[in-house]
Curated annotation (Swiss-Prot):
Function: O-methyltransferase that catalyzes the 2 O-methylation steps in the ubiquinone biosynthetic pathway.
Catalytic activity: a 3-demethylubiquinol + S-adenosyl-L-methionine = a ubiquinol + S-adenosyl-L-homocysteine + H(+); a 3-(all-trans-polyprenyl)benzene-1,2-diol + S-adenosyl-L-methionine = a 2-methoxy-6-(all-trans-polyprenyl)phenol + S-adenosyl-L-homocysteine + H(+)
Molecular function (Gene Ontology), one example: 3-demethylubiquinol 3-O-methyltransferase activity
Pfam family, one: Methyltransf_23
Family recorded in the similarity comment: Belongs to the methyltransferase superfamily. UbiG/COQ3 family.
GO biological process: methylation
Name of the protein: Ubiquinone biosynthesis O-methyltransferase
Broad enzyme group: transferase
Pathway linked to the protein: Cofactor biosynthesis; ubiquinone biosynthesis
Alphabetical keyword list: Methyltransferase, S-adenosyl-L-methionine, Transferase, Ubiquinone biosynthesis
Range of residues in the leader sequence: none
């Protein structure tokens, strides 16, 4: 995997600029017409894919790494999982907790680096999700290792991120951020995108075996997202420990 040059506290795998970027938008996490509209739109696809692969989430311990305002965390909790959501953007976690209180959905939100949690709770989770997150940290391979450590033997770890090629630059940055304005400008850095082969290598090195991959596409005419076999831009990868 490529590693972007980022500013972060010594020993902590975090890009402070990324944390501040999402903190500035925290109040709008649950507005389906805000900058987070794409996440609301793709969430049913993500949840369905996780359930299709890992089976029912009812009663399972699930970790949502990089949970932000809790969009995926809450939906997995509604599906019956015992969910822990972690993020380093305190403002986003505050919004997640408030929304959980309003909706009556119980999720344990914590501000802790995933590497620290892995040392604290190794092998404790049936399912670990790391969605739209790897491209926002200085050392994605470290996150993959931590996710693997947190999963139980036989547990599932799910990733989603962006492929790195000319098409993904055109679609995910030029198209999504500048033409269609689906995302704020500067949301993504092309150098931080990760090829599926790179993610698969990091997963195997961490003791995870990739089991499947799906692409995610957006139709600007119908404004609908769908899963597909096309992994050239957005893709999801399932792995098992």
């Amino acid at each position: 995997m490529t590693t972007a040059t980022q500013s972060s506290a010594p020993g902590v795998n975090v890009d402070q600029a990324e944390v501040e970027k999402f903190s500035a938008l925290a109040a709008r996490w649950w507005d389906p017409e805000s900058e987070f509209k794409p996440l609301h739109a793709i969430n049913p696809l993500r949840l369905g894919w996780i359930q299709e692969t890992a089976g029912s989430l009812s009663g399972k311990r699930v970790l949502d790494m990089g949970c932000g305002g809790g969009i995926l965390s809450e939906s997995m909790a509604v599906a019956g999982a015992q969910v822990t959501g972690i993020d380093l953007a305190e403002k986003s976690l505050k919004i997640a907790r408030l929304h959980g209180l309003e909706s009556g959905v119980k999720v344990d939100y914590r501000a802790v680096p995933v590497e620290e949690l892995a040392a604290e709770q190794p092998g404790q989770y049936d399912v670990v999700t790391c969605m739209e997150m790897l491209e926002h940290v200085p050392d994605p391979a470290s996150v993959v290792r931590a996710c693997a450590a947190l999963a139980k033997p036989g547990g599932w770890v799910f990733f989603s991120t962006l492929n790195r090629n000319p098409k993904s630059f055109l679609f995910a940055i030029v198209g999504a951020e500048y033409v269609l304005r689906l995302l704020p400008r500067g949301t993504h850095s092309y150098d931080s995108f990760i090829k599926p082969s790179e993610l698969a290598t990091s997963a195997r090195q961490a003791g995870l075996e990739p089991t499947g991959m799906r692409g995610m596409e957006y139709n600007p005419i119908t404004q609908v997202y769908s899963l597909s076999a096309n992994t050239s831009v957005n893709y999801l990868m399932s792995t098992r420990k």
